[in-house]
Amino acid sequence: MTQTSENVTWLTQEAYNQLKAELEYLSGPARTEIAAKIAAAREEGDLRENGGYHAAKEEQGKQELRVRQLTQLLENAKVGEAPAADGAVAPGMVVTIAFDGDEDDTLDFLLASREYASADIETYSPQSPLGSGVNGKKVGEDAQYELPNGKLASVKILKAEPYQG
């Protein structure tokens, strides 16, 4: 999955199906389960000091937040439209960079949102310091991004190819 504009997110069909299944579960069976937990905890009496009740309500809040996130994500999804292989870094691309121009010190990563993170390859969000620094650059260009300590780091774009995972 990758951000292709402010609101549109590119997803593979597989990622779309997984997120849709998660949304269906959270909107159906998971809501029923959490409602039952809340009802059971409520029957225990005093809600002010009822740890089970408060834990269930907190879980419900997190679950509803995820439902809203998934709903928005899927409403704005473009399925199957991979980024162009034109040498420009864009979300949905596997990018190879060299740190400080040292071509022996490289990193391969997927520029994509966290929902698309894979165990196969490190993923950086387009909104992360590194992601925003390289996004839009072309192969051969240099990019800079701010480190957590406030210093600037320089990288050279060696390769940018559409993700095939």
From Swiss-Prot:
Top-level taxon in the UniProt lineage: Bacteria
MF terms (GO), sorted A to Z: DNA binding; RNA polymerase binding
UniProt key word Transcription: yes
Coiled-coil parts of chain: 55-78
InterPro entries, per database record: GreA/GreB_C_sf, TF_GreA/GreB_CS, Tscrpt_elong_fac_GreA, Tscrpt_elong_fac_GreA/B, Tscrpt_elong_fac_GreA/B_C, Tscrpt_elong_fac_GreA/B_fam, Tscrpt_elong_fac_GreA/B_N, Tscrpt_elong_fac_GreA/B_N_sf
A UniProt-annotated Pfam family: GreA_GreB
Keyword Transcription regulation applies: yes
GO biological-process terms attached to the record: DNA-templated transcription elongation; regulation of DNA-templated transcription elongation
Keywords of the record: Coiled coil, DNA-binding, Transcription, Transcription regulation
Gene3D superfamilies: Transcription elongation factor, GreA/GreB, C-terminal domain (3.10.50.30), Transcription elongation factor, GreA/GreB, N-terminal domain (1.10.287.180)
Family annotation (HAMAP family): GreA_GreB
Family statement drawn from the similarity comment of this UniProt entry: Belongs to the GreA/GreB family.
PANTHER family, per the entry: TRANSCRIPTION ELONGATION FACTOR GREA (PTHR30437:SF4)
The protein's role, per its UniProt record: Necessary for efficient RNA polymerase transcription elongation past template-encoded arresting sites. The arresting sites in DNA have the property of trapping a certain fraction of elongating RNA polymerases that pass through, resulting in locked ternary complexes. Cleavage of the nascent transcript by cleavage factors such as GreA or GreB allows the resumption of elongation from the new 3'terminus. GreA releases sequences of 2 to 3 nucleotides.
Protein's UniProt name: Transcription elongation factor GreA
Organism whose genome encodes this protein: Streptomyces avermitilis (strain ATCC 31267 / DSM 46492 / JCM 5070 / NBRC 14893 / NCIMB 12804 / NRRL 8165 / MA-4680)
